C-alpha cells in the first residue's frame, strides 16, 4: 500500500500537477506558488502557506516532496529546505532537508515537530523525490474537552519512522503543546523559509 504512488480508488486527489483547484491561501485567495512542467508545485517564499478547501478528520495522506539544491553550501540546519505538513491545520510532520544536515532531533525530517523524533533518518539527498505516508488519527473532543488524543503513524520513503505516537497538542515552537477543541479542519502545507522545495502527487483517504 505504501509503495504504490498511484492513488487508490477511494482517494481524494488533492494535487495532480495541473492546478490549485483544491487549495487556497490566507483569506481564501488563489495560491501564488508555482506549478512546474513536470507536474510538481514549488513553494514561493513569502507568498503564504496553502490549505485544502476541504476539511478532514482522520486520514491516510500521501505526499511527495523534494528539497531544493540552490546555494545549498551556504545553508545548514533549519535554513535548508524547510516546510511542514499540518493535519487539521494544527499538528505538524516536519519537512526538512535532513540529508547530512544535523539539527535538533525533534526538528528533523519526519519528526512530529517538537514532540517526537523519527525512529530513523530516512532522508534522501536534495534533488531526489521523497515520500511521506501518514496515518493520522484525529483527536476527539467532547463538550470542548479532550476525550481522546490524536496519533501519528508515518512512513518516510517506505520506512516506518513514527509508530502510532501520541500527539500532545497543537504544534508550537516554544513551550508545551496544548489542545484546543476543534472539529474537522484543512490540511496545510507550510511556507516557511530558505531554499524552496517542491511537492507532487498528493492524495488523501478518509478513515472515518
State what each model feature region is.
Residues 1-208:
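Carbohydrate-interacting regions of secretory-pathway proteins
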Amino acid at each position: 500500500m505504501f509503495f504504490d504512488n498511484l492513488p487508490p480508488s477511494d482517494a481524494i486527489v488533492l494535487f495532480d500537477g495541473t492546478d490549485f483547484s483544491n487549495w487556497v491561501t490566507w483569506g481564501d485567495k488563489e495560491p501564488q506558488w508555482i506549478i512546474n512542467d513536470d507536474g510538481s508545485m514549488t513553494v514561493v517564499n513569502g507568498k503564504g502557506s496553502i490549505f485544502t478547501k476541504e476539511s478532514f478528520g482522520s486520514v491516510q495522506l500521501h505526499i511527495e516532496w523534494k528539497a531544493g539544491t540552490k546555494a545549498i553550501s551556504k545553508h545548514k540546519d533549519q535554513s535548508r529546505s524547510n516546510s511542514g505538513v499540518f493535519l487539521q491545520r494544527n499538528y505538524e510532520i516536519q519537512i526538512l532537508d535532513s540529508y547530512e544536515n544535523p539539527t535538533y532531533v525533534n526538528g528533523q525530517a519526519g519528526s512530529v515537530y517538537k514532540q517526537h523524533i523519527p525512529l530513523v533518518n530516512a532522508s534522501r539527498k536534495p534533488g531526489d523525490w521523497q515520500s511521506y505516508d501518514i496515518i493520522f488519527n484525529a483527536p476527539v473532543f467532547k463538550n470542548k474537552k479532550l476525550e481522546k488524543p490524536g496519533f501519528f503513524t508515518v512512513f518516510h520513503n517506505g520506512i516506518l519512522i513514527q509508530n502510532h505516537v501520541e500527539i500532545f497538542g497543537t504544534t508550537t515552537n516554544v513551550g508545551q503543546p496544548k489542545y484546543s477543541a476543534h472539529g474537522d479542519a484543512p490540511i496545510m502545507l507550510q511556507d516557511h523559509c530558505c531554499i524552496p522545495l517542491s511537492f507532487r502527487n498528493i492524495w488523501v483517504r478518509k478513515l472515518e
